[in-house]
């Protein structure tokens, strides 16, 4: 995260880490797993990216900010590390348009559904330039170690999950109107 302007430079993420422990429903399967989370900020600790085998970008959905982060990642990352975005809205082609070919081959979208602990679906969005072996390793890791149901998706608007979800909502609304249901009745049925 960004460094805090007052108090500890990691105050923002320290507070976020505390909120993880207090969240209901719980975000961690076991509270002791909180010790597996290392905190830091983007100014003082960015060099640590070089130690990661997989870097997941999850900043605000603004392409200028994402491109800035990718530029910084590319300068410090391991040559063979996998880089992904957790976006649910921005096309892969747009995210990767300013990347070197070297980084593009190891860049994809890993769209985790929220809340991540409880939602089993993970979409991995790829493009033809991706290193197929790396994508296979990522898919296996997410399936076997994270327990996700992984689907490989094309770079299309809404990917797969959101396209199906929006369609289901449209069908439910259309049927509710046809049946003359109230909002409460429609919510109970659909």
Regions found by a protein language model. Give the residues of each.
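Rossmann-like NAD(P)-binding element
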Residues: 2-83, 90-94, 98-101, 121-122
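A non-catalytic, amphipathic alpha-helix used as a structural packing/dimerization or gating element
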Residues: 11-15, 19, 65, 133-144, ...
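Generic secondary-structure signature for well-ordered alpha-helical cores
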Residues: 18, 22-25, 75-78, 136, ...
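A short alpha-helix-loop-beta-strand transition element characteristic
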Residues: 29-32, 106, 133-134, 180-184
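Rossmann-fold dinucleotide-binding core
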Residues: 79-163, 167, 188
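Acidic, glycine-rich segments within the central catalytic cores of soluble metabolic enzymes
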Residues: 163, 177-190
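Alpha-helical scaffold elements that line and support the substrate/ligand-binding pocket
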Residues: 167-173
């Amino acid at each position: 995260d960004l460094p805090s302007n007052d108090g500890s430079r990691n105050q923002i993420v320290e507070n976020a880490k505390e909120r993880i422990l207090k969240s209901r429903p719980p975000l961690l399967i076991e509270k002791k797993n909180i010790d597996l989370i290392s905190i830091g900020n983007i100014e003082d600790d960015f060099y640590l990216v070089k130690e990661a085998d997989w870097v997941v970008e999850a900043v605000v959905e603004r392409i200028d900010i994402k491109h800035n982060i990718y530029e910084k990642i590319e300068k410090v990352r391991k040559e063979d590390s996998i880089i992904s975005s957790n976006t649910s809205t921005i096309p892969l082609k747009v995210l990767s348009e300013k990347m070197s070919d070297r980084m593009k081959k190891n860049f994809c979208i890993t769209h985790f559904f929220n809340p991540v602990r409880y939602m089993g679906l993970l979409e991995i969005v790829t493009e033809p330039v991706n290193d197929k072996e790396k994508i296979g390793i990522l898919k296996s890791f997410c399936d076997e170690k994270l327990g996700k149901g992984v689907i490989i998706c094309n770079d299309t608007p809404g990917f797969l999950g959101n396209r199906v979800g929006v369609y289901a909502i449209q069908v439910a609304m259309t049927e509710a109107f046809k049946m003359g249901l109230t909002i409460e009745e429609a919510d109970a049925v659909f």
